[in-house]
Amino acid sequence: MTLKELQIGKSAVITKVGGEGALRQHFLDMGMIPGAEVTVVKLAPMGDPMEVQIHGYELTLRLAEAEEIEIEQIQKRTRDHRGIEQSKNTDHPGLGESGKYHSRDHENPVPEGTILTYALVGNQNCGKTTLFNQLTGARQHVGNFPGVTVDRKDGVIRGYENTEVTDLPGIYSMSPYSSEEIVSRNFVLNEKPRAIINIVDATNIERNLYLTMQLLEMDIPMVVALNMMDEVVGNQGAVDVNTMEAMLGVPVIPISAAKNEGVDELIRHAIHIAKYQECPVKQDFCDKEDHNGAVHRCIHAVVHLIEDHAEEAGIPVRFAATKVIEGDHLILNQLKLDENETEMLEHIVSQMEKERGLDRSAAIADMRFDFIERLCEQTVVKPKESRERVRSEKIDRVLTGKYTAIPCFIGIMVLVFYLTFNVIGAWLQGLLEWGIDKLSVIVDAALTAMNVNAAIHSLVIDGIFTGVGSVLSFLPIIVTLFFFLSLMEDSGYIARVAFVMDKLLRKIGLSGRSIVPMLIGFGCTVPAVMATRTLTSERDRKMTILLTPFMSCTAKLPIYAFFVSVFFPKYGGLVMSGLYVLGILIGTLIAFLYKGTLFKGKPVPFVMELPNYRMPGIKNVEQLLWEKAKDFLQKAFSVILIATIVVWFLQSFDLHFNMVTDSADSMLAKVAGLLTPLFAPLGLGDWRICTSLLSGFMAKESVVSTLEVLFGGDIGTVLTTSSAAALLVFSLLYTPCVAAIASIKRELGSKWAVIVVIWQCVIAWAAAFITHLLIH
């Protein structure tokens, strides 16, 4: 019987994990090991993927992957241990403190002035970035979705200037399955930080401790931060920290990063272990008695075999031993074993497999989870089913229900756009426009009274106020849209959208995880492109990056709002929503084209942890909105201001630098006139339109500022309804801004960046031409 055949609500014991390569190793690292109990929670609304519970947490996987896992059904769970009944009064081991782990007389600190470097390592969605912000005072974005951090972030611990802490992408193990796992593993292995701060989600402790055990093998000073302890205690659970510290051999500090509780104590221990280079007391967690010590003997034999090679390669020997037993080719290549040693290694491993009755990877994973189970049985008072879990189950009955999930998603997105464009955002925009207009009148009167030079007067009023002011008025709409996107991500809903949409996205050749970068793309293409790093398949990553520009970013909102208010005032919300839908539809058609040509093959397997729903943090939402508002304002007073001044200058002077009365005689008209034949078939043959679209390559918001400067409010007399619609469609689809192209270049290289610019312009021209023909 396979996991695919197990009915909803039923439990079983895993007997065999099929498949091969990195995906199989990833399943084992996630706890899908022979002997583990698994329960089917539900199927996605479209029947695939499935959600299962294992080791106390929820995991999603496709039916095709579930078919590779053989099981034996059981009537009820048998290994759902309760842990200890109550926390014991165990003596504190005092690890990471002076006078206990070592004598004060024999302290040997690192030289004064040495930079103490730290790696902040933990599972995805365990609160790493929140802790990083508390440690450093930084304001990194925090979300409730696995994989928010997609690149390393560095900062200095507050109050300790000779420190540097690096927030690494969330990982489940030190196996190189995804690009973020490779980033984190390489940092620890190659850059050799002075210490590791391992953050563990105490509400999901068994899953998180798997990574802890691998980090202990790195032989680097380490402190374990038990995060979310406030939730554990709130659900009547507890952790015997002293016993856990003694069993792990490193300091263990209970904290709540969100509430800034226990962080100061964590810092003191982190500084101490790095300063005195206190490495883990224990690294040997294999049981000598387990299956006659088969795994124990294997690990120790391999340690002796590769010891000199590991030292030469600069890899911790215990870590190297378990990795080569698992079959990690990257580590094996670094060790450079000769033919005889390789043959001996394989002989040792095959003998262990024979005695243990499991293959090499499963045996090592089982050894780790076996120790974790013993550890938790002696140290953890199991909490009652958490309020967060109960609440999540109730919400999921609606938001991921078979018949309600898709309607709910559509309804939520429609509500978000309606509130943004017709209610909250529109009202705030009107308020800001009124303020800018009043200020413009006051400044105009002051400049006139002061008898300021006509050119300067024109620059300030017709250039800066008209251009930058018009763009600034769209700030409320952008902030409002980001507010709703932040609520969706912070609450944990976006992770459910990935689960619900996986089967649908698979039809166009993508994984459900690709929905996340695309949804982020509605905010800004730059972070959306970066978010693709969480995708484990290079094929999926490239395809998602190339499709992201079809998701209309907030920078285009000023263009839509400007033309809609002039040409379609009665149907504002409908036209704007229609543009978003059109972008998605064209993106879908292009995806089918990619699937059959450039990106043939199967999408990456869908393996993802579903976090509990959480109330969005007010501070986090405020932080995100401030960041987006600040970015927009910086752009408005840098790129857009410069673009506005340049456009004003070029359209105010001729080639001999004489001020012109008719802008048709200006430098700008001469240059932009070269492009007008290209845009004439779209009904956009005016040089001023071509100029504004060119300025949009620097920043999409500058399209509106350029139009305001060049037309001065008379654009309604120049364009027809059909040409305005064509311009909207062209703006929706043509090349992303220079910042987005730079991020694509960074991820895929110069060739792909150039291809994206040309390809998007071709698609935009064709779609705009068809739109003009249909309406005309």
Q: What does each model-found stretch correspond to?
A:
Residues 550, 554-577, 739-749, 768-776:
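Transmembrane helix-loop junctions at the membrane interface of multipass transporters and ion channels
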Residues 232-287:
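Canonical P-loop GTPase G-domain recognition
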Residues 249, 276, 283-450, 659-668:
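Extended helical scaffolds that flank P-loop GTPase cores
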